[in-house]
Amino acid sequence: MNYRGIYRRRYVFVLLLLVAVVNISYGWTVLKNKDYKRRYLSPSGVEKVRKHLSRKYVASRNNTQTFKKHYFSNTWAVHIDPPDNDVADRIAKKHGFTNIGKIGNIEGHYHFKHEEIGERELEKARHKTALLNLEDEVKFAEQQKILERVKRDGIPNDPYFKDMWYLLNTGQASGPAGVDMNVVPVWKKNITGRGIVISVLDDGLDWTHPDLEANYDQTASIVLNDNDNDPMPRDSDADNCHGTRCAGEAAAIANNGICGTGVAYNAKIGGVRMLDGQATDALEASALGFRGDHIDIYINCWGPKDDGKTFGKPGPMAAKALRLGAEQGRNRLGSIFVWATGNGGLTDDDCNCDGYTTSIFTISIGCIGDHGLSAYYTEKCSSTLAVTFNGASHKEGRENKMVTTDLYHQCTEEFKGTSASAPLAAGIIALTLEANPLLTWRDVQALIVHTAQITSPVDEGWKRNGAGFHFNHKFGFGRLDANAMVNAAQSWKNLPAQRKCTAASGFDHQDIPRGDSLFINIPTVACESSSAQIAKVEHVVLTVSFVHRRRGDVSIDLISPKDTKSQMLSPRKYDDSDEGLDEWSFMTVYNWGENPKGIWRLKITDNPNQDDVMNLFNGDNTDDVESLEERVIDTQTKQNKAEWEKMRKENPYFDVPYPNGVRKNKVTIEGSTQDHVKPKEGAKEPWGNYRNTNNINNNSSTAFKRKKKQ
């Protein structure tokens, strides 16, 4: 289990249309003691009032009182019955208050203010409250507590949030500012994943982590390896951190001063421990089918080996569990299975060789770095639906931070791989489901297709299909955009029922010429004039069998009637198997929205010269556009750094901040406008001449270009 030529046989082609609070405000009301109700207070009466105020007040169960410093303002709420503004003015003036006016539209409630009572004058304030309550017309008088309120600007206060550039990119990483998952606008709408349940199918979940515990859902958790209900990982093995890290990215708690923030920080999170032992078809089926009536989203960051030579797929029971989850999960709306595409780019692996990511029932998620470029370990295939960020670079080198929860109640910034991307997608889907809980599993996929954003736009791999959707074998339909998905979901109309149409190839055995291609036409009327008729396709599944002396030499392309080309299988230089394939199902989503009626063309190629083929597909020793982008970025970074170093050497004050008491203004010296600083009036000037200390920020052409780009 991995954490995230051709001769005679038959070819079968299948087209599938999937289609188709009560906020209880705690405060104090000073209770009146009718024994104190006198026009004037005698000395004994004053003493009684003081004794009354010195003990803890008896209040209704919705009211409590703690007199603490800095908790009370110099304003009072006073209820006068019968309502009379003149009476309110008279009582206010009598006791040194000003009647500010009525409180909103509440009948008989007035707002009094006392200018001479400070927030620390507790005894004086208590006495004034008692005096007001002794007035016959006053039903109650209450000094107003200063309430702690914060702006709901959607920005969490967790200590590591500033490093989470993929959630809010202010330019803190090496990439341009503003390029992120666009989740903050969703949080500002108070959509935070509330009511959605996510479960991580992995090596366990440290649910006692303080950044996860309050969101933990025991009902969404189990241990399949040991028949236990506690998904705590075996923390004696530090490698068993994978599930805990995935969980934190999706649903870590916000605004608790701990670690970072999950995308859906109010969603519930559970864990299915199933990777801490031997994997079997029965175990995987049990995990994928666990509590489909309760769990909305399943995070899966595992699969077959990413070694460039393995073909692996779900067993019959696991495959059935995926199908039943889509048909019956979430009260028949369909469970959402999010799957990491894999990290086999360095071994020229192809995610279409992974039967989990090619299932029509899963959402296959790839990764990009902060510049929108593919990671050096990205796998390309036609089943990838979309991408999210992780910390990787396009070529092996610098890495950016990915913040999440870790074992031993720690926080890590070192989470990597597509395992760091899929949980972000799960969190965004949780936000989407909160916005519209009636979305089906196919609706969620369709929303991704409709709202994903182009990343790395200069990459020549971007194409448009016959329905107008942009796609790329590296990036799917693009980068997930949380705000766009949520906005679309709120007015989304459910897709009609799913239809399936099968088109046979109509031939038996054919040979492929060595070093050449075999072309096969597959006509279809898309089940016209039947209940299975399809007008707009969603998924296309191609089932192929072949034998070949070297399986890795084979590539397969499928061209739709709208001339959209999907690479179903790319050559793999490490795949030396002579076993071929037996009824392997490849899948493409890149015909989404097209009318499938017409002639589909299948191209199967024998590629005997692997060096040339690898250069063609991977860009080695060729003009790889992404590599060019990376080189430009690195060059700009080096130039900028060199310019800063030069300024630092030439100016001894370059790194010195402006001291307290300094004011800065612009002056013209020899025709050039420069910063000039001097003490504020009355301040001493112990530091001497303090000019031109920050010119690089204001005048550097490199800095200006970067700022403009952002």
From Swiss-Prot:
Composition skew (Low complexity), residue ranges: 689-699
Signal peptide segment: 1-29
Xref: InterPro entries: Galactose-bd-like_sf, Kexin/furin, P_dom, Peptidase_S8/S53_dom, Peptidase_S8/S53_dom_sf, Peptidase_S8_Asp-AS, Peptidase_S8_His-AS, Peptidase_S8_Ser-AS
UniProt GO molecular function: serine-type endopeptidase activity
Free-text tissue specificity from the UniProt record: Predominantly in the body column.
Disulfide bonds: C259-C411, C351-C381, C501-C527
UniProt enzyme class: hydrolase
Residue ranges of every copy of the P/Homo B domain listed in the record: 495-638
Carbohydrate attachment residues: N23, N62, N190, N698, N699
Entry EC number(s): 3.4.21.-
Compositional bias (Basic and acidic residues): 673-684
Biological process according to GO: protein processing
Chain positions listed as propeptide in the UniProt record: 30-152
Keywords for this protein: Cleavage on pair of basic residues, Disulfide bond, Glycoprotein, Hydrolase, Protease, Serine protease, Signal, Zymogen
PROSITE patterns in alphabetical order: P_HOMO_B, SUBTILASE, SUBTILASE_ASP, SUBTILASE_HIS, SUBTILASE_SER
Positions annotated as active site in the UniProt record: D202, H242, S419
Occurrences of domain Peptidase S8 (ranges): 164-486
Residue span of region Disordered: 668-710
Function: Probably involved in the processing of hormone and other protein precursors at sites comprised of pairs of basic amino acid residues.
Stated family: Belongs to the peptidase S8 family. Furin subfamily.
Protein name: PC3-like endoprotease variant B
Origin organism lineage: Eukaryota, Metazoa, Cnidaria, Hydrozoa, Hydroidolina
